[in-house]
Amino acid sequence: AIKKKKKSVPVTIENKSGFKGFFSNNLFIVLAFVIPFVLMTAAFGVMKVSPFGDNQILVTDLWHQYYPFLADMQEKLKHGESLFWSWTQGGGVNYFALMSYYLMSPLNFLTVFLPSEWLREFLMFSVVIKVACASMFMAIFLRSLFKKNDFSLVIFGCSFGFCAFFMGYYWNTIWLDTVCITPLVALGTVKLFTEGKFRLYIVSLALSLLTNYYIGLFACIFVLLSFIAYNIVKWDGIKKFATNILRTGIYSLIAIGLTAFFLLPAFFGLQNTNASGATFPTTFAINIGSTNDLMGVLEAIRKILSNFITFVPPAIKEADALPNIACGTLSLVLGILFFTSKKISLKEKIVDGCLIGFMIISCIIRQLDYIWHGFHFTNMIPYRFSYLISFVLVVMAFRAFMLLESSSCWDVILAALFVALVI
């Protein structure tokens, strides 16, 4: 008798009670936090960063702005001083507005329990924790979306946590909270679209805006792009589409409303600042290519694609740098397999390809770059939304990994060769 080939099914997530049960159910989620935590701590140890040596991570804006602001906040928390006004910056400053951009990481409030001389070490470990959280949240997203519970969650979680954006901009601690929350915003968005559940969406989006409203803007744009992509792939008539618009709009407004007590002071505070490059570009121009034409765009695309390679050193603070988008060779090869898999519909391939393509083009065309960054051009550190490209690629790679059994060895080899040829 000929035996029928068994279909591969996702690993069932058992729900066991008690502490041991919780640990057993979430073993790979825990590992997705612990392993990056250990690796980042070891890396700082090898680099002899304090407390492991005499070096420190206080560079550029972290040294000139974030560290002094955090030291001031620590003093205010310890001595019960006002969080609405400060006399330590210039002739006085609206401290509430300053906090809304620079100091709203939940970890910062833990400094009230620390001696002031430990602040540098605190900042180092806060980076470690945020990288570990990014990996863990990515693992949670992948497990919930694909119903798989094995060590692959750790691997792909780390692909996001150790992506070039984190490694290049680790010193920009005020951004990292919102970036590491991105998988939870995406998971909340998925649950809102597919199940009508709104709690995670509201809480995660509100936290993204609260921890840093500037990077939170990218989360809002990503929700919009996800909404468009989902409704194209899962089109179910105009009535369902209208319902989705209404539901997403209402819950998004609730999330924004929950943070209004911080966003409004920040908005009014921004009216008193000088913005960099606040004029919308009226003529076609590109950021990366050498000429403002089709050939320049193609040149820019080639350069950006080359930056997917893992061993390309990430940009740290160069204004003319390429976007930090590398997230591992595995993600890159599996990302190619995503487009060759027969198990994935053509519509899904086109939509996901267009999503990544749009974000890449947004790095090139100055008008799109201007819109992404809140109708401004950035002052150093370009393409601040580029972490979303890494996020989407890792998700696509995991989708292809789930269907790897349907791909032949030659498919994998050809995908790797294609990556080497194009990049």
Name each model feature, range by range.
Residues 60, 64-75, 81, 106, ...:
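Periplasmic/ER-lumenal interhelical loops and adjacent helix-loop junctions
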Residues 43-146, 150-183, 207, 211, ...:
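Active-site lumenal/periplasmic loops and adjacent helix-entry segments of GT-C-fold
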